[in-house]
């Protein structure tokens, strides 16, 4: 019973940390990363379609993304979608290939992005703490129903706290890594 609660809490905490890492990977650094364009949605024959389904995106070099479009007629629509995004990018096309040079980030923009990343990390920490609270509530309910002893409850809560500390540390590590990426010149 307690092991199920701990396993559930661990799984949910892992998912929270993965969601955070996924979220902050979309924040633009000075370095080209294909995941930067993951959020781009293109109108494809009247249906909103993720860019990944219409083209292959690779990092050509440290400051350039290359997009190989599967359907040549979609090139203008993809360019338009990239320009319409709030990423501040200017794509240029040559046939079925679109090149997206990444301009260097200004100091002010870097600081804004760090604020965004810190906010995301705080949401990640809150999520992990909420999962801890849920697990502790379930453990207290077991104690109240006399299904476990007070010693078992204390031990389980200590284990949940260790899990929480571990996952909050992972959130902090992801934040530190992203901040370092943002401050690179």
UniProtKB/Swiss-Prot annotation:
> What SUPFAM superfamilies does the record point to?
Ribosome recycling factor, RRF
One GO CC term on file: cytosol
Q: Which GO terms describe its biological process?
A: cytoplasmic translational termination
Q: Which domain of life is it from?
A: Bacteria
InterPro entries noted in UniProt: Ribosome_recyc_fac, Ribosome_recyc_fac_dom, RRF_sf
Task: Cite the entry's keywords alphabetically.
Answer: Cytoplasm, Protein biosynthesis
* Gene Ontology molecular function, alphabetical: ribosomal large subunit binding
Main localization, broad class: cytoplasm
Where does it localize?
Answer: Cytoplasm
Q: Tell me which family the UniProt entry assigns to this protein.
A: Belongs to the RRF family.
Q: What does this protein do?
A: Responsible for the release of ribosomes from messenger RNA at the termination of protein biosynthesis. May increase the efficiency of translation by recycling ribosomes from one round of translation to another.
Its protein name is: Ribosome-recycling factor
- Origin species, per record, is Photorhabdus laumondii subsp. laumondii (strain DSM 15139 / CIP 105565 / TT01)
- Source organism phylogeny: Bacteria, Pseudomonadati, Pseudomonadota, Gammaproteobacteria, Enterobacterales
């Amino acid at each position: 019973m307690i092991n199920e609660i701990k396993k559930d809490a661990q799984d949910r905490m892992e998912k929270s940390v993965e969601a955070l890492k996924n979220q902050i990977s979309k924040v633009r650094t000075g370095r080209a990363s294909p995941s930067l364009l993951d959020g781009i949605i293109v109108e494809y024959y009247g249906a909103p379609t993720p860019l990944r389904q219409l083209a292959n995106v690779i990092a050509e070099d440290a400051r350039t993304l290359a997009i190989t479009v599967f359907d040549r007629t979609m090139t203008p629509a993809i360019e338009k979608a990239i320009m319409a995004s709030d990423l501040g990018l200017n794509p240029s096309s040559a046939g079925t290939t679109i090149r997206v040079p990444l301009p260097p980030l200004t100091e002010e923009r870097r600081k804004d992005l760090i604020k965004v990343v810190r906010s995301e990390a705080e949401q990640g920490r809150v999520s992990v703490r909420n999962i801890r609270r849920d697990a502790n509530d379930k453990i207290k309910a077991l104690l109240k129903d006399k299904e476990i002893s007070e010693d078992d409850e204390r031990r389980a809560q200590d284990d949940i706290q260790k899990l929480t500390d571990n996952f909050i540390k992972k959130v902090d590590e992801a934040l530190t890594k992203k901040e370092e990426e943002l401050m690179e010149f």
